[in-house]
Amino acid sequence: MKYFFYPKRRFVTFALIMNNNSKSPVSDLQYQQLLLRMEYEYEKEEFKRQTETMGIARKVKRGLCWYPVSPGRSYYNSLNQLVIDITRTENKEIEHSFEFGRPVCFFHQSFDGKVKYMNFIATVSYADEERIVVVLPGAGAVIELQADSSLGIQLYFDETSYRTMFEALEDAIRAKGNRLSELRDILLGTQNPGFRELYPVRFPWLNSTQETAVNKVLCTRDVAIVHGPPGTGKTTTLVEAIYETLHREPQVLVCAQSNTAVDWISEKLVDRGVPVLRIGNPTRVNDKMLSFTYERRFESHPAYPELWGIRKSIRETGSRMRKGSYSEREGMRSRMSRLRDRATELEIQINTDLFDSARVIASTLVSSNHRLLNGRRFPTLFIDEAAQALEAA
């Protein structure tokens, strides 16, 4: 079994790679599709079973649910998403599994113990020990939540991650005569990776094995794999390889299976003075970790106050248009159009500035499919803890 990664120009993966005896890369990936479908169906049924049979108290203890919770203020975040603060009022000492990007659902428990789920799905934007910020589908959801006095929140089955992985497998299976097909065949063992000859770089602060690994990474044209037992310094080697690669390339993408691993790499790179842009929110929340997240950087941009004001005007104008007469609506349409054009212009400007100033873009594997990264290309992709991920991720 080998790990397949979404295509970039070349890959540096840090994983334990096992033998694969499949007949061809395509048949291997088709088999992975079957395995992923089995896992998808199992998790879906397990979620259904937990939802229908597992009591709230047990789900709370497992970190899958908060109950009771208190809805706080609702507002539009820097990405112009409608969000609401959710705070748990009991069992604050229990660790939970809520984190950025995970879907959630809300429920109400009546006096007789019956649970009724609300008819919408939300997404976690931020989570710490006592508070979750949730992206809502619309203003109606805010009204529904704030009117409920016996509210709970729990993790929902993650269709989005599975959909992303199925699409990645399908893209790789259909690839023909392009860079994706080359990397697919290399990663699955039917084509040898290429390496360039470079004069070895000395790293006196690394041991000889780590130094050799970094130099091997620098010489690769396609794929390099660094593997070894736990505690042998693979992540240290990864950080050094990234740092050295940035002497040769303007920007790289760094991914890991878990948010915790992405946080760890990002923090180490920031300590080395590398400008990092973190897609998604960290699991450990402090000013240092938040300072390089996309949302915090977006809000700190000099053009953001103007953008915030324009977005507010758009919402207010839209509200007046819905309430006004036909002639009034016609008069406001041109204003709305100008406001939207200016908002789009500012969003593009801020987004361009943030990505142009970053040397490392960091995210989980699934979050690398985030809309913010659509259409972007990176000369090199680094993946930490690759053996912990599903092939499709």
What are these regions (language model features)?
Residues 385-386:
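Walker B catalytic acidic pair
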Residues 14, 19-37, 91-215, 267, ...:
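Pre-ATPase regulatory/linker segments immediately N-terminal to the P-loop/RecA-like helicase/translocase core
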Residues 237, 241:
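Hydrophobic positions on the alpha1 helix immediately C-terminal to the Walker A/P-loop
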Residues 220-226, 250:
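Pre-Walker A (Motif I) flank of P-loop NTPase domains
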